[in-house]
Amino acid sequence: MFDTIAAVSSPHGTGAIAVIRIDGPKSHDIAKKLTGLNKVEYRRVYTTYLNFEGDILDQVNIVFFKSPNSYTGNDLIEIYTHGGILVTQNVLDAILKSGARIAKRGEFTKRGFLNGKISLVQAEAIYQIIEAKSEVSLKMSLQNLKGKLGEEIEYYRGEILNVLSEIEVTFDYPDDIELDEKSILNLLSKLKDEVGRKIEDSKKSIMLNNGIVMTIVGKPNSGKSTLLNRLLLEDRAIVTDIPGTTRDVIKGEIEINGIRFVIVDTAGIRETKDVVEKIGIERSLKEIQKADVILFVLDATTGFTKEDKLILRKIEGGNYIPVWNKCDEGNNFNKIFDGEIKISALNGEGLKNLENKIVSKVKNIIESGTASHVITQRQVEILERVYTHLESAVNNLNMGYEIDLISIDLRRALEELDMLIGRKFSDDLLDNIFSNFCVGK
């Protein structure tokens, strides 16, 4: 049985309107007491005054929702007050004094899940929508809110359940029904491969959600920090004519064509005896290993140098874009690289061409990532365990093991899928998911 909770659902601060929710068995009684409304129609907006202990609190709009037709599945009230901090707090205080308690983080959405209004995947999608920092992330999360991933998981469940039912029929009628092990092997092999592809696409999906890591590398004074500042549209890095100014890794975030990128500016790579600069260079080399795409910045006024050759050896085999910078100052180079881009980080010349090149370089990540609807690490880890159980079932079938061993593998895979969508769950799991939400959601 749920108790009655309340919280401000809109962001803290001053605005035109604030939203306060009350959920639970006492919610309607509390609202009627504060408004003086007795007979109400559900899901209709009323404009009235809130009164408490003889004082007018605010003129508000209020909506009554009747269980189960609400966000939570319980009796629910939404009050729209004027958006001042004080007036909002006064209204909330009156609600709490009238019999509600303050809601915990994500408790409204958690109640919706527990009442079957949404799946666990949809609950996670709501959080991802709120936290989305790029158009691509938002679109993926909205697809999950519509139930896209849930449909895919139900398909996996259905295939496994079909095989299990075939196996269990042979347990009940061993002399009458012969199991078609070849057909089951083909089906499970196909399903295992589908889950494997989903996992690979999902890792790219999470990469898109978290931001594709783009590392800027180059020799000292090639204009890396100027390029970082130009891409970020702010002076994040110190820019001077003195080589080796950047000693540490500097990070920022941008969006290009709806794709989120985490940009990493690194210390200039060269041979040096300076102890501090050496540490910065070591960190630069580590960032190169983490990069999804590398901007290899070269100086058009000096051409391709020994230092550039040293850096090229470090990044060869990686997903890099050769970027000739300072093209407004010099043209001291011949075409050396395929796909090289000419820019001036100082005045922005060629920047659009560079952005287009960056997007094309990560095209595979974008296409695979947006094809997947898995957007959390929890979901990926569960699918990896599902894959392991399916792989075990296929191997056991191939080696001619008893069919009841295959049944155990499939039941374990099924349990994992149930955990993914929330058919089965633990209190710790729910606390871990919903504690990330804000109070009021």
Swiss-Prot record:
GO biological process: tRNA methylation; tRNA wobble uridine modification
Classification via CDD domains: trmE, TrmE_N
Keywords of the record: Cytoplasm, GTP-binding, Hydrolase, Magnesium, Metal-binding, Nucleotide-binding, Potassium, tRNA processing
Principal localisation: cytoplasm
Coiled coil location: none
Binding site for K(+): N221, T240, I242, T245
Cofactor needs: K(+)
Superkingdom field: Bacteria
InterPro entries: G_TrmE, GTP-bd, GTP-bd_TrmE_N, GTPase_MnmE, MnmE_dom2, MnmE_helical, P-loop_NTPase, Small_GTP-bd
E.C. code: 3.6.-.-
Positions contributing to GTP binding: 221-226, 240-246, 265-268
Cofactor binding description: Binds 1 potassium ion per subunit.
Database matches in SUPFAM superfamilies: P-loop containing nucleoside triphosphate hydrolases
Annotated binding of Mg(2+), by residue: S225, T246
Protein location: Cytoplasm
Leading EC class: hydrolase
One GO term describing the cellular component: cytosol
A single GO molecular function term of this UniProt record: GTP binding
Function: Exhibits a very high intrinsic GTPase hydrolysis rate. Involved in the addition of a carboxymethylaminomethyl (cmnm) group at the wobble position (U34) of certain tRNAs, forming tRNA-cmnm(5)s(2)U34.
Assembly behavior: Homodimer. Heterotetramer of two MnmE and two MnmG subunits.
Recorded family membership: Belongs to the TRAFAC class TrmE-Era-EngA-EngB-Septin-like GTPase superfamily. TrmE GTPase family.
Protein name listed in UniProt: tRNA modification GTPase MnmE
